[in-house]
Amino acid sequence: MIAYLSGGMEHALNEGEGRRNKMTKWLKDNLGHSVIDPVKSSRQYVDDTGSHNYRAWKQSDPERYKDFVRKLIHQDLDGVINRADYVICLWDDGVLKGGGTHGEVTIAYHHGIPVYLVNRLPFEDLSGWIFSCSTELFLDFDQLKENLLKLYN
């Protein structure tokens, strides 16, 4: 089984790398599942293309920036649609200024891929769209892990 690790990157601390690393280890150790980590895959693409300053292109060369980010979008959505068995998503303040997480959750729902959403916002602030795209909603990662053990162990 393969989990896609969704959640804020662009406006999250260290692109959400720490929580993704913890979840990757837990999934491997407890369920034998692998992951698609968009932080790692995006960094690999940046390294492969020598595009370490791509964020500056948003101001200096918007078309180049858009073209580059579209390649990252394609890579991420392909991972959700064609490779992932389920999506684990952290919904917190880090997703509110971005758009990728919204798209990943929506496209997973549209393709019938389960979305396990860990919500850290007040429930009344959680978008009805995102709530309705989620298969199950959790208050924290411990609840999510208990559920994953029941489902996949």
Whereabouts are the PLM-identified features?
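Conserved catalytic or regulatory cores that recognize and/or transform ribose-phosphate-containing ligands
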Residues: M1-N153
